[in-house]
């Protein structure tokens, strides 16, 4: 059995660790609220762009934008969104598992893959498996910078428009609630005809699409022309989806980190209680032994 001094040192060490995890939990909780606000703030913009773009395409059905054209898939692009740091539970492990499964599926179908990594964890994974990396962006911080994101994704979008890849996917973690984050592997391009939002419920998306289809007899005045407006709107819509993928992952990261640090703090508290019990028993045994020795010595005298 360890001595009293050794147990006291262990208790002090665990107490210090608990202070750290408790502080990290509080920081993550604060960042989580801000990340959720940013995530939700982007949704109205994406919804309105989707509505206008859907209306324009219904009013101009003869125009087939490359982002909407389905073609035989021989090569694809994959955008993997992960965190830069750890200590966020199984967040990165889960999305990595889903991504590896999809990459294996593409390999079995003889489909070429080129990848873009957002976050150090994803970059490390793609490097280890020898994936073809065409762009990367790490150290994104707590707030996604759209210019940096677009700089990294431009290679993939250009390759799609020029026919070097036939589809573009994004692997990220969708924020459901504070306790639940869901790894998802979504097709970014080509867009579906209804311009469904992959980060919102299917019921809401279908309702919005039905609403647009039921009332498109009116029209806008386009400057310079409808084709140019559709091109610009679809480009912005795809950029918005990419931003949303990163924002969802950041909100999921802070939620997962807060939960992980709370669990660590609770476990540390339990360990401290167990060590305190052992300390008390050891101290009591030592006192009892000393008393027995004193009584034994007195009896011998």
UniProtKB/Swiss-Prot annotation:
Keyword Cell membrane tagged: yes
GO MF annotations, alphabetized: ATP binding; proton-transporting ATP synthase activity, rotational mechanism
Entry-linked NCBIfam families: ATPsyn_F1gamma, PRK05621.1-1
Function: Produces ATP from ADP in the presence of a proton gradient across the membrane. The gamma chain is believed to be important in regulating ATPase activity and the flow of protons through the CF(0) complex.
Protein name per the record: ATP synthase gamma chain
GO BP: any one term: proton motive force-driven plasma membrane ATP synthesis
Primary localization: membrane
Record keywords: ATP synthesis, Cell inner membrane, Cell membrane, CF(1), Hydrogen ion transport, Ion transport, Membrane, Transport
Species of the source: Bordetella parapertussis (strain 12822 / ATCC BAA-587 / NCTC 13253)
Subunit structure: F-type ATPases have 2 components, CF(1) - the catalytic core - and CF(0) - the membrane proton channel. CF(1) has five subunits: alpha(3), beta(3), gamma(1), delta(1), epsilon(1). CF(0) has three main subunits: a, b and c.
InterPro entries tied to this protein: ATP_synth_F1_ATPase_gsu, ATP_synth_F1_gsu, ATP_synth_F1_gsu_CS
Subcellular location: Cell inner membrane
